[in-house]
Design a protein with these regions (language model features):
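Autoinhibitory propeptides
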Residues: 2-19, 42-126, 138-142, 528-581
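Structural recognition of the beta-strand scaffold that forms the well-ordered cores
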Residues: 24, 91, 152-155, 234-239, ...
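Short, surface-exposed ligand-recognition loops at beta-strand->loop->(often short) alpha-helix junctions
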Residues: 24-34
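Glycine-centered tight turns that cap/initiate beta-strands
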Residues: 86, 165, 313-316
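Active-site core segment of subtilase-fold serine proteases
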Residues: 113-234, 247, 251-262, 266, ...
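Substrate-binding/access-modulating region of protease and related hydrolase catalytic domains
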Residues: 142, 147, 213, 237-313, ...
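Hydrolase catalytic cores
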Residues: 238-241, 342-422
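C-terminal subdomain of the subtilisin-like protease fold in secreted/lumenal serine endopeptidases
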Residues: 264-269, 314, 328-330, 383-580
């Protein structure tokens, strides 16, 4: 590992670019690890490791021992792998800049801030808004059984610190560091060469919002204390990144599987990217089948809900402020499930100054902060009803869907709430715990197998992933979903992609099967490219709204996309290049 390179990339966000980590390979038949090894060796040589993942015996993770491939080479090799007999799909894996660091012509706020402008000095305002204390008093009256007792939350993040607000509830010996591959997930607050990181101790403030005991555990410089939603819950720290700038999708996937195998009941993921990734989806499915409730951040200052929050199996959380208004940086869209406090929420923070560690409680902002609070509510629900009893009654894999349904049914709409934008509304912990459990035969629970089909992969040839990425630009924002409008909006997107990929609309599904994954990758990791296509789509949408008398065929004719194609031609694989020229 080149620690100096890592340090430079982390310290200077402008230097960040996707970094190759390996491949995801899906085979047609189960139990073919030896065949995968043969394919990889024949194609690339001996320095590759093959590991079977998931429950189907058809999915494999392939990693390289030494050299690192360029993005272009990785995609070229993925097409080589796909062409081999028996291979259903091959997808390159990358560590990617986190979506809330990307420039989409928006101005992100600093995550942790001391500004007193519009600052709510009541450190428990977020808990009061979610009616957490009412839930405690009604459903956890025994002082010897604190709210959330018996529940374990897995936290893939930057690791733990010994902050007094969290340390008593951290299961240190159960943790794992996926950066160093050892059992100590401690957040070192700096990159390997000693460079201090922007937004340090991210894992500390997400931990504190879940399980900090009530009130200050010591005197802090701010003079404040704080309280977590489920102070009886324990946390497994899983260190997957140095800072919330560069996300290893491979590390996150491994951490999710590790949590499922090591006793976690809930997962809180305050990380995400714009990449639909089969390796990550495999891990999500693996955990969901074992009954883990997975909660993830919708994203900050991006025009779509990031993954893994966008997966159907995951509860996607966007954020609001103390006035019950949506926070301006919150991602929004149809994939959002619920809203929770995220703007100037008080949480624990650990800093390193001149080699000395300093602990404090400060306000922070971002969907990273609403996510662990909803995970805390999940812990309260499991603790109150008894997870073992829920498994006995429903089976493990239905628990996440039952909770998601009850959570959404218990939400409260707020003044600026819009359907298909902010989920069901602001979460209400008291209502969640008061809600009756469904009958075994209820049809309101989404069957796990059905949920897996609701967001098909790009290689199916469908538009879903692109419709998701450009939901804000393409789809009509009216409050009621109009079927004919959706058809027309899909037609516009289809026409634009067909022109971009130099094909007809009828042949577009086949073209997307061939190169759609690579196109989506560049759109998610290149802000300039995304912006160019978004503007073309938005312009087309505006034109069609002004000229209602045009026919559907005329209104769906896209703007010129030559500039988008020119950007793509600079970097793409040889296979993709032939489809663009």
């Amino acid at each position: 590992v080149n620690f100096m390179d890592i340090s430079d990339r982390l310290h200077n966000p402008n230097n960040l670019s996707p970094k190759f980590e390996g491949f995801f390979i899906e085979m047609a038949m189960p139990g073919q690890k030896q065949r995968v090894q043969e394919i990889v060796t024949e194609a690339f040589g001996l320095d590759w490791n093959v590991k079977q993942i998931g429950d189907n015996s058809t999915e494999f993770e392939v990693t390289l021992n030494k050299e690192v491939l360029s993005v272009k080479d990785a995609w070229d090799k993925s097409y080589n792998l796909r062409s081999q007999p028996g291979v259903v799909d091959a997808q390159p894996l990358f560590a990617v800049p986190l979506s809330d660091r990307q420039d989409f012509n928006l101005e992100p706020e600093v995550v942790m801030e001391r500004s007193i402008d519009n600052l709510n000095t009541d450190v428990e305002w977020s808990l009061k808004q979610m009616r957490v204390f009412e839930a405690w008093s009604r459903f956890f009256p025994d002082p010897n059984r604190p709210p959330g007792h018996g529940i374990i939350i897995g936290l893939p993040d930057t690791g733990y610190t010994e902050h007094p607000e969290i340390i008593t509830n951290i299961l240190i010996k159960k943790g794992y560091d996926f950066l160093k591959n050892d059992q100590d997930a401690k957040d070192e607050l700096e990159a390997p060469s000693g460079v201090l990181l922007p937004a340090p101790s991210h894992g500390t403030y997400t931990s504190s919002l879940m399980s900090s005991p009530r009130g200050a555990q010591r005197n802090y410089p701010s003079g404040k204390g704080m309280t977590g939603v489920a102070p009886g819950a324990k946390i497994i720290p899983l260190r997957v990144c140095y800072s919330v700038i560069l996300l290893s999708v491979l590390n996150l996937a491994k951490a999710i599987e590790y949590a499922a195998d090591n006793g976690a009941h809930v997962l809180s993921i305050s990380l995400g990217s714009g990449l639909f990734n089969k390796r990550l989806r495999s891990a999500i499915t693996y955990a969901q089948k074992r009954g883990l409730i997975i909660v993830a951040a919708a994203g900050n200052f991006v025009p779509y809900v990031v993954w893994p929050a966008a997966y159907e199996e995951v509860i996607a959380v966007t954020g609001c402020d103390a006035q019950r208004e949506i926070w301006k940086g919150s991602a929004r869209g149809q994939q959002v499930d619920v809203t929770a406090p995220c703007d100037k929420v008080w949480c624990a923070k650990t800093k390193k100054k001149n080699g000395e560690i300093e602990y404090d409680v400060e306000p922070g902002t971002g969907t990273s902060l609403c996510t662990p609070q909803v995970a805390g509510i999940a812990a309260l629900w499991l603790s109150y009803h008894g997870r073992d009893q829920l498994i006995q009654r429903y089976g493990a894999e239905k628990i996440p869907f039952i909770f998601n349904q009850i959570l959404r049914d218990s939400c409260e709409e707020f003044p600026t709430w819009k359907p298909n934008k902010f989920g069901a509304g602001i979460v209400n912990a008291e209502k969640v715990l008061a809600a009756p459990l469904p009958d075994n035969a209820t049809r309101s629970i989404i069957a796990p197998a059905q949920a897996l089909e609701q967001h098909p992969a790009i290689d199916s040839g469908k538009l879903d992933t692109f419709a998701h990425l450009f939901e804000e630009q393409v789809f009509d924002s009216q409050e009621e979903t109009n079927f004919m409008q959706v058809v027309e909006d899909n037609k516009k997107l289809q026409a634009s992609l067909a022109e971009l990929l130099q094909t007809t609309e009828s042949e577009l599904p086949q073209r997307l099967k061939e190169v759609g994954q690579e196109l989506a990758f560049y759109l998610a990791t290149n802000p300039e490219l995304y912006q160019q296509l978004a503007e073309a789509l938005k312009s087309e949408n505006s034109d069609s709204n002004q000229l209602k008398t045009r026919t559907l065929t005329e209104s769906s004719k896209p703007n010129n996309l030559d500039s988008v194609r020119e950007i793509l031609l600079q970097n793409v694989s040889e296979v993709f290049k032939t489809k663009l020229e």
